[in-house]
Amino acid sequence: MSHDRFVFLFVAIFVLFLASCRGPTVSPISSVPPPGPRSYAVYYGEKSPAPALSGVDWAIVQDNYPPGKNGRTLYFAYISMGEIDPGTRIAKDISRSPGGLESVTLGKNLFWNSRIADIRKKSFRQALLMQIKRDTKRGFGGIFLDTLDSPLEYGRTHPRQAAGIRRAMESFIETVHASYPTLYIVVNRGFGLLPELAPFVSGVLYEDFCSRYDEVGKHYVTVPAGEREKFLRDISRARTHNPGLVVLALDYDDPRRPALSYPCARMARKEKFLHYVSDWTLTRSVPGPPLGWTGE
C-alpha cells in the first residue's frame, strides 16, 4: 500500500470515529413540551394587589397595573394589536404622526368605541413596538396581544382592501419575537392565523371557550359545540408547529349565579387547557363548581 493511500485510509477511519462519538441531532422544536404554567388569571381592574392574582403562575393585566415582584407570577401587559382604544398612549402617539388616527383606521367597534386598526401601517407598528419597550422596562415578562380577530374579520369581509393584512400580522409578531427572544407572548384567539403564529408565541388565550357574554342581549350564554370544534382543530394544527403551546381557556359567567360555566371546567380539563372564569368586565373572578358537583 502506497504512503498516500495509507494516509487517506487513516483519515477516513478517524472521521468515521468522530462521527460515531457525536450526540444525537437536536430538532429545532422539541417533541416534548417544556413545563408550563399550572394556573392563570385575567384581571383588568385597578386594585393592587388583586385577590384574583394571588398565587397564579401567569397573570394578564392592563399595562398600567404594577407587575408584582414575588418571583412566582409572570405578568403579561395588555396590548391591543387589532384595535385602538381612545385615550391610550398608543392612540396619542399615532395622533401625532402624519395622517393621524384616520390613516390607520379600518373600521369601528361600536360596543367598545374603538377603531379597528391596520397593522400594515408603519405608524401603528412603531407605536405598538414603543409600548412593548415601555412595558418590558417596567418589569413585565410577557405581553398579551388582544383583538387579533378584528382585522382578520375585516379581511374576510373586505378581501381587496385587506390584502396582505394576515402576513403583516404574522410579520409583526415575528419582529417582536426576534427583538425580545426571552419575552413571553400570548395572543387572544386569532385561530385562523394561529398555525402560522405558533412558532413565535408561548400561548393562546381561548376567550369564550364554553360560555360568553352576549353584548347585544347583555346576558351570559353557552357557546355552541360546533363553533368550539372548529377552533379545537386550529389549535391542534398549531401544536404541530409548537408542541409546547399553552392554551388558556377563558369563560364568562355571572358571579351571583355561576352555574352556566360549571361544565366548562370539565371540558377544559379534558382538553388539557388551563381554565379561568370571570365576569364580563374582567374585574371579578367567578368560583368554579362546588365540591361534589356532578353536572346534574
Describe the predicted segments one by one.
Residues 26-296:
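Glycan-processing catalytic domains of CAZymes
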Residues 1-8:
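Bacterial N-terminal signal peptides that target proteins for export
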Residues 22-24:
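Sec-dependent signal peptide cleavage junction
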Residues 18-20:
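C-terminal motif of bacterial Sec signal peptides marking the signal peptidase cleavage site
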Residues 8-16:
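Sec-dependent N-terminal signal peptides
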